[in-house]
Amino acid sequence: MSSIRLTQYSHGAGCGCKISPKVLDTILKSQIPGFDDPTLVVGNSSKDDAAVVDIGNGQGIVSTTDFFMPIVDDPFTFGRIAATNAISDIYAMGGKPIVAIAILGWPINTLAPEIAQQVIDGGRQVCHEAGISLAGGHSIDAPEPIFGLAVTGIVPLDAIKQNDTAQAGDILYLTKPLGIGILTTAQKKGKLKPEHEQLAPNAMCTLNKIGQRFAELPGVHAMTDVTGFGLAGHLLEMCEGSGVCATLDFKALPLLDEVDYYLSEGCVPGGTLRNFDSYGAKLGAMDERTRNIMCDPQTSGGLLVAVGKESEAELLAIATQAGLTLSPIGQLKAYTGNQFIEVIQ
């Protein structure tokens, strides 16, 4: 493992670097009309994970990009996490990745090029695991290290899973534990105990391949990955877009080990507060601990799946085959005009 501490060279970390939802809404308001493309099946109007273009014969091309600054100190692991996170958007749409190209920003006068090579190698290893080539890319001299991928995938048009097509009565599942932002903040602050160093990276480096299997089920009505806006933010996008509201069982939420310890040590990412400031008014009442977990920015987080009862048993069988033990975390119902998300303690 490298002795370089990459997190000391960036002001943010992972998906916690994302611009807050409130500010992003302002940025994306445009006076210029976009091209009206009849083949564009999924664009940015629904705040979805990737774009999808109809290429005929019932097939769609899925296109996405994701990049960020270091969330861990080890360069190779940083590359793995960034690549896993970028490819996840393809799986979240129900697609199969087919090729990736790299995006690299590097402070060439501060960090040796050999360290950047380790980052790229980490990304290449994950691409190999996903069964795709890292086929090229683009690099610039930048004040802080940045790495990510632009990924292209393919999906049957009748298997696309969007984030705004959930239905009242759907059961909610989450495929990875929460708390990634909390533990990586502990690392950046120098408070992470050595025996806990692999808890977050192990989760972040796990590909969301199972999304492609879930997409085969017609009763999976909506799917998205949980990243920088936290569980609350990405569930809110699902609820607002679908015209539903959610009731979550807080005790059922999967959490990384030691999350509460590091919360007690003050390891709350800045992104948590930015997230709550952006959408907290649309959430039901919750205490500080609940807020800090619900709004915790995840990097390479799990899939949030809304499934009808008719496909729930099949979804759980697929998860079991993949070595995942899933439990329901909540349920959706028709929006009643109050808060979109209620958390039951």
Curated annotation (Swiss-Prot):
Residues that coordinate or bind ATP: 18, 46-48, 66, 89, 137-139
Binding site for Mg(2+): 49, 89, 225
UniProt GO molecular function: ATP binding; magnesium ion binding; selenide, water dikinase activity
CDD domains the UniProt entry points to: SelD
UniProt superkingdom: Bacteria
This protein's UniProt keywords: ATP-binding, Kinase, Magnesium, Metal-binding, Nucleotide-binding, Selenium, Transferase
Catalyzed reactions: hydrogenselenide + ATP + H2O = selenophosphate + AMP + phosphate + 2 H(+)
Co-factor remark: Binds 1 Mg(2+) ion per monomer.
Kinase recorded as keyword: yes
GO BP annotations listed: selenocysteine biosynthetic process
Site, as annotated: Important for catalytic activity: 18
Cellular component GO terms held in the UniProt record: cytoplasm
EC number(s) from the headed UniProt entry: 2.7.9.3
Cofactors demanded by this protein: Mg(2+)
Xref: Gene3D superfamilies: PurM-like C-terminal domain (3.90.650.10), PurM-like, N-terminal domain (3.30.1330.10)
Keyword match Transcription: no
Top enzyme class: transferase
UniProt subunit comment: Homodimer.
Known function: Synthesizes selenophosphate from selenide and ATP.
Assigned protein family: Belongs to the selenophosphate synthase 1 family. Class I subfamily.
HAMAP family: SelD
Name of this protein: Selenide, water dikinase
Native organism taxonomy: Bacteria, Pseudomonadati, Pseudomonadota, Gammaproteobacteria, Aeromonadales
Gene for this chain: selD
